[in-house]
Design a protein with these regions (language model features):
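Bacterial N-terminal signal peptides
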Residues: 8-17
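Bacterial N-terminal signal peptides that target proteins for export
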Residues: 1-9
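Secreted glycan hydrolases and related glycan-binding modules that recognize and/or cleave
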Residues: 2, 18-270
Length: 270
């Protein structure tokens, strides 16, 4: 019996060693290279472009047929939460979209340093009113809440997401953007009542490559919802070809407003 157990343990350890070794193997050289401009454009043609208020969206490149992107995640309203009040902003210029491009309205929320840990009733009502107001523009059947809530507002954020889900009509799904490190903070993201979680894999700081490798291989320590089909990338800092291939539903951000600005870029919070 002891021999059987010892043999079984040996096989398990050997198998585990092979698995760990395989997980730690670097990607083949061709797949580890950053995606080229042509590969980014090809991905964008079948995916989603984030369009912020200072942009008119991606332009056609060359003689490509069809629209340069499939869906436009357009920031339609922004709300800055401050101590006891809400500041509203949003798009001030008209947006002309190519024929056939469907809109995903994005409600963007920011918390200033003096914002309370728990939202005031007026702040909560303002966010939910924006969600209801723009749900009718969701031609893609999806509305996105873009809110990088600080840790002190985590519980308020979870309650807000649940309320936003309730505020949407039955035919409109809810998407949320998340910071990459949120995906390593337990399973709280898996418990959100949302239809889509979009980890933003750009502006990752000095450990950017480590983060991207974790998403490349679908690290089991990442929250399950962070290993879904949607991933957020930036055109100026493209992912590896392997990571791009993993994203069945890429979202693309462009630091230069797609070189098609509608007004000077500006930040909501100085």
């Amino acid at each position: 019996m002891r021999r059987v157990i010892a043999h079984t343990i040996a096989i398990f350890l050997l198998t585990a060693g092979v698995s760990v070794s395989a997980a730690q193997q670097p990607a083949p050289e061709g797949l580890s290279r950053p995606a080229s401009a042509a590969e980014v454009a090809a991905s964008l043609a079948g995916s989603v472009a984030w369009i912020w208020p200072d942009s008119n969206g991606p332009l056609h490149q060359g003689k490509a047929a069809g629209p340069p992107y499939r869906e436009a995640a357009v920031l339609v309203e922004s709300l800055v939460l401050r101590a006891g009040r809400v500041e509203r902003g949003g798009r001030t210029q008209p947006l002309a979209l190519p024929a056939g491009v469907r809109v995903v309205p994005v409600v963007h929320v920011e918390a200033a340093a003096d914002a309370p840990d728990s939202f005031t009733p007026a702040q909560r009502s303002a966010i939910l009113a924006a969600v209801r107001r723009h749900a009718g523009r969701a031609a893609a059947g999806l509305l996105q809440l873009d809110f990088e809530a600080p840790p002190r507002q985590r519980e308020a954020y979870r309650a807000l997401v649940a309320a936003a889900r309730e505020a949407l009509p039955a035919g409109v799904r809810l998407s949320v953007t998340v910071l990459a490190h949120w995906c390593t903070q337990g399973d709280w993201l898996d418990q959100l009542n949302v239809d889509e979680v979009v980890p933003m894999l750009y502006r990752l700081g000095p450990h950017a490559e480590d983060w991207r490798r974790r998403f490349e291989r679908g690290d089991s320590r990442l929250a399950r919802r962070c290993r879904g089909p949607a991933l957020g990338f930036a055109t100026n800092d493209p992912p590896s070809r392997m990571l791009l291939a993993r994203a069945a539903r890429p979202y693309w951000f462009d630091e230069a407003a797609w070189s098609n600005p509608s007004r000077p870029a500006g930040h909501l919070i100085p």
